[in-house]
A protein has these predicted regions:
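TPR-repeat structural position
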Residues: 2-3, 28, 59
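Canonical positions in the second alpha-helix
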Residues: 6, 35-38, 68-69
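Structural marker of alpha-solenoid helical repeat scaffolds
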Residues: 9-12, 38-41, 72
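Start-of-helix register in tetratricopeptide repeats
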Residues: 13, 44-47, 78-79
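Terminal, low-structured helical/coil segments at or just beyond the last alpha-helical repeat
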Residues: 71, 75-97
């Protein structure tokens, strides 16, 4: 998929899909900017924010959003276990239990 085209098309919407397009095109700072304006009580937003923060090397903040995601929807743990990019956050979380 052409993620840069998706960014171009979704940029005006400033929503979850726009953030996902930014992240997929490796525009992580732009993705985080959009996510910062979205609802932190949405587990999908928290999950994506955790992933972007992890990419940016902000592990403590990423862990915070990963745990928040799980608090809102425990099933997201299963999703994270299947996502190689979330491996470090899952491992850190498992070490804390």
């Amino acid at each position: 998929m052409d993620y840069k085209k998706a960014v171009y098309l979704l940029r005006p919407y400033d929503d979850y899909n726009a953030a996902l397009a930014f992240m997929s095109a490796d525009y992580n700072h732009s993705a985080l900017d959009v996510l910062s304006r979205l609802d932190d009580t949405d587990p999908k937003v928290c999950y994506l924010k955790a992933m972007v923060l992890s990419r940016l090397g902000q592990q403590e903040e990423a862990q915070k959003y990963y745990r928040l995601c799980l608090a809102y929807d425990p099933y997201m743990r299963h999703r994270a276990n299947l996502d190689p990019e979330m491996h470090l956050l899952v491992k850190q979380d498992n070490n804390n239990y």
